[in-house]
Amino acid sequence: MNVPVLPPIPTDEVSPLPVAERPARVATRGGALDLLRLLASLLIVIYHFGAEGPMRIERFGQVFSRGFLATDFFLMLSGYVLGRAYGASTLTGRISHGRFWMRRVGRVWPGHLIVLAMMAALVLVLNAIGTDAHKPSRFAWDQLPVQALLVHAWGFNSDGWNLPSWSLSALVVCYALFPWLWRAADKVRRPWILPLVGALAFAACEVVARLVFHHALPDLQFRFGVVRALPLFILGVCLARAVEMEWPSERAAKVLLIGGFVLLVAMQPLDRYALPDELIFDLPCLTAIAAIVLGAGRLPVRHPKAWIEEGAKLSFALFITHIFVGVIYWSAVHKLIETVPIGIGWQWLMWLASFPIAMGAAWLFHTYVDQPLQDRLAPWLRGKR
């Protein structure tokens, strides 16, 4: 249950105030939000690799079965980051609606296609070898075109291949709506109203999910990902506009950040499905995540850390490559365990080794594939060629 990680905020496009009123630029990278982005991406990998160890790791704690919380964070953060990065540009007309959408799709689609092509080639090789260690049923060829086109969260069924990319598909729709959403948020003059607007959007989509699909929002099938992603994206946009209006105060932001963490941690021992209704768990967690995003976003980054910024930049690459890496690694590991007696301790070590391997692969992809490709595409996406 994963979600895309956004690229860095373009430093030339963050403008919360009219030109004449802009304060000196403050650092936006290397702070709390970047650290949270990195930690959430790691939680997503842990969630997806959790079933591959000697025993399912949710036995050690409910939090390891809750990848949807990291997904909620990323979807909300997507709206927040775009609001901070592109909000002013969409209002002033410096970037057109179509150009904005092309930039956003151009950021996520090429990398997605490359990883999907590598995955298809890998499956062909594994099928030719005759192994079933990669669980061939997960790779139905008739579902590949839908996923390649990034429309599999628009009601089309595609539950295999690079499964977490459903959130990219959903965000493509959110990107198309962003300029209108930001203009609507810009009309609100009292910043405290904005989080309430986001909460109402979530409530409306929760009602739709229950009446039409008979599930709570986090439990929707991935093919209905747009319904799940849109309210969280809207809430992120609303929080970004509130921060641009310098709300709340820095003191209140610290309280929100700490209080959000405390509430989120306090909810984790609860069994979500043992409660009378999933909302008893979902609403406090959503409130906590929103408080964390708002609090961390409002606080200035006074001591940016380069390692945090670089780690956050890897989050998108980690998101789109970890399933591909997992297919290779876990196919080999499970085949090895089937053929050679390996103690439980060594099996746990092999499980732990999967995380630095996934991070290393993400770094290679980011450094030698995704970033060079983005550098090549940038002039066209910016309309300079």
Positions of predicted regions on the chain:
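Central hydrophobic cores of alpha-helical transmembrane segments
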Residues: I193-A203, K254-L263
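Alpha-helical transmembrane segments and their helix-entry boundary regions
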Residues: L33, F100, V108, S167-L168, ...
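Conserved beta-strand->loop/alpha-helix structural units within folded catalytic cores of enzymes
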Residues: L38-S41, S78, R104, G111-L113, ...
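Alpha-helical transmembrane segments in multi-pass integral membrane proteins
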Residues: V5-P10, V14-A32, L39-L42, I46-G67, ...
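Membrane-interface helix-loop-helix regions
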Residues: H97-G98, M102, V108-A170, A203-D219, ...
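Membrane interfacial helix-start motif at the N-side
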Residues: G106, P110, A312-S315
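His/acidic/aromatic-lined binding-pocket segments of jelly-roll/cupin-type domains
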Residues: D72-F74, P231
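Hydrophobic alpha-helical transmembrane segments
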Residues: W101, W109, L113, W192-L196, ...
